[in-house]
Amino acid sequence: KIRIITKLDNPDWIILAVKSYDVANLIELLRNCSAPILCCQNGIKTYLQLTEKIGKDRIAYMVTGIGSSKIGTGKAEFRGSGFTFIGEASGVASPRLIDLSELIRKSGITCEVVDDVLSYVWLKTIINSSINPVAAHAKVVNGELRKPELNKIVHKICMESTMISTEIGINLPLEPWLEI
């Protein structure tokens, strides 16, 4: 059973793990609470929504490469762990974020605190936008993107997206193609 809440009673953190299209519906609820928010989203739009409407001082972001695959309705299977980075939108890691990162590590997830979390959001966006449409169009799981004919397409998309991020001044922390 899931307990639905409509009021937040002074939590230490709000962990926002919903689909990006649901974030807009939560803005008012989040704005009326003073707790910091850890957003577990892939994508730049949500980052911009939260920082513009709530403020950078309360927003932290988690970017992860932990993989899973849907194996049935309401069921997923773990496919491997990759990177997990967290950082505050303000660019300064507060003691509360350091404490949260320790808690995440204690749960068995490798977690690194970073200063420029937006660059990691961009990294993840480039990775997802390179892989997901090709896998969906070809109707294959991500592992099958290693096939030369599909890998070539993924590579081209990744290089194009990386070039765009560079053109607009995003300093990517890692090379996206090497992370794919």
Q: What does each model-identified segment do?
A:
Residues 1-75:
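Rossmann-like NAD(P)(H) cofactor-binding subdomain of soluble oxidoreductases
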Residues 33, 53-58, 74-174:
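Internal alpha-helical scaffold of NAD(P)-dependent oxidoreductase catalytic cores
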